[in-house]
Amino acid sequence: MRKVAFKVNEDLLELLDKYAIKHGLSRSEVIREAIKNMVKEELEKDSIIVARVEKIRIW
């Protein structure tokens, strides 16, 4: 895996740490899952839009 560095404010870091502790995960695991879920959700939205356009074209 490659390393990526970025800055977060104290409030976000506190939320991240609380979530990680509650779920027994590391910060990195929480961040990876959050990014994966966000990207997956966005791609699914795009797929739904494409599917709707294709359905309209078929009719």
Curated annotation (Swiss-Prot):
Alphabetical GO biological process terms: regulation of DNA-templated transcription
Matching InterPro entries: Arc_rbn_hlx_hlx, CopG, Ribbon_hlx_hlx
Pfam families xref list: RHH_1
Superkingdom, taxonomy of origin: Viruses
Protein name: Uncharacterized protein ORF59b
Native source organism of the sequence: Acidianus filamentous virus 1 (isolate United States/Yellowstone) (AFV-1)
